[in-house]
A protein has these predicted regions:
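Short, amphipathic alpha-helical interface elements at domain boundaries
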Residues: 2-202, 308-331
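Short, structured motif recognition centered on aromatic/hydrophobic residues
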Residues: 126-130, 134, 210, 214, ...
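Short hydrophobic beta-strand motif reused across regulatory alpha/beta modules
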Residues: 136, 219-220
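Acidic, Ser/Thr/Pro-enriched low-complexity segments and adjacent helix/loop capping patches
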Residues: 195-203, 217, 223-225, 231
Length: 331
């Protein structure tokens, strides 16, 4: 009897289950239908908890991302504020451009007609600029200890500098055999030679080409001025901030930041002082000074000019070609 009752109950369950599936009344999945009610509710609660935790973590991540972006925005703005285009342009000025800028009249846009030193001074700037960039050096002094002015200029690297004038001078020095001395190269690049076979070494229109470089860098502008019978291209100053920073740098080197030791000075700044003096434009940087400051500045410049280039070139951490150019102008 019990056996028949169990069979009857089983068949009834099967019939009810099949009817429920066929009519689509059962909304509980098959795997959850066999679970007790408390287990099903627990699963639903746990799944809801996981969803809430996932959503909370997403919201927190979004907030962190937004806050991170807000933190980066002021930093970017600070970096942009710190980037001064004037400073960037000043750092790109070569020694030749700095010397020419000191010699140019701000409004007129040309150098003094009576200045016959700036031409050779600019050629000396080219040699030092190439030496500071690792393109030129002096030959070894040897056992006999040749003097600076007797040693030849050697091409250390012929890699382009990106400056047309410097690359042109570098090509001349590289292709010339036998090599020439510093004094000879200053004369050859200036065209001051009696040998007609060496006139092709002369670099032409140097001041005009340097002025055009300064125009491209936003320091100068280009104008035409009429001088009685002919027109002349001039380059008046358009960005006075750069020139003022240059003048201030030269003044501070011999006043507030004077170190009384040329080897503790920046090599480029030291070369600028020497070559600006040799080009007869250094006093233009000292013109705004008071009388006491002017006297002190010129006194310290004279101290630099009285140095012995031969002895200074033998000291550690020095540039021999720089002192060779100084010797060529101060001999």
């Amino acid at each position: 009897m019990d056996k028949f009752r169990a069979i009857f109950i089983r068949r009834r369950h099967i019939r009810l289950y099949s009817c429920g599936r066929s009519q689509g009344r059962s909304s509980i999945p098959h795997d959850k239908a066999n679970l007790p009610a408390d287990m099903t509710s627990l699963t639903q609660r746990s799944s809801g908890l996981v969803q809430r935790r996932t959503e909370a973590s997403r919201n927190a991540g979004d907030k962190d991302h937004l806050s991170g972006e807000e933190d980066h925005k002021p930093r970017r703005s600070e970096e942009q504020d710190g980037d001064d285009p004037g400073d960037a342009k000043e750092t790109r000025l070569t020694l030749m451009e700095e010397v020419l800028l000191l010699g140019l009249k701000d409004r007129e846009g040309y150098t003094s007609f009576w200045n016959d030193c700036i031409s050779s001074g600019l050629r000396g700037c080219m040699l030092i600029e190439l030496a500071l960039r690792g393109r030129l050096q002096l030959e070894a002094c040897g056992m006999r200890r040749k003097g600076l002015l007797a040693r030849k200029v050697i091409c250390k690297s012929d890699a382009p500098t990106g400056d047309v004038l410097l690359d042109e001078a570098l090509k001349h020095i590289k292709d010339t055999q036998p090599p020439e001395t510093v004094q000879s190269w200053i004369e050859l690049l200036s065209g001051e030679t009696w040998n007609p076979l060496k006139l092709h070494y002369q670099l032409r229109n140097v001041r005009e080409r340097l002025a055009k470089n300064l125009v491209e860098k936003g320091v100068l502008t280009t104008e035409k001025q009429n001088f009685l019978l002919f027109d002349m291209t001039t380059h008046p100053l358009t960005n006075s901030n750069i020139k003022q920073r240059l003048i201030k740098k030269v003044q501070e080197a011999v006043l507030d930041k004077w170190v009384n030791d040329p080897h503790r000075m920046d090599k480029r700044l030291l070369a600028l002082i020497f070559l600006a003096h040799s080009s007869d434009v250094l006093e233009n940087a000292f013109a705004p000074l008071l009388d006491d400051q002017y006297d002190l500045a010129m006194k310290r410049v004279r101290q630099l000019l009285e140095l012995e280039p031969e002895g200074e070139s033998m000291k550690a951490n020095t540039n021999e070609l720089l002192w060779a150019v100084v010797a060529a102008f101060t001999k």
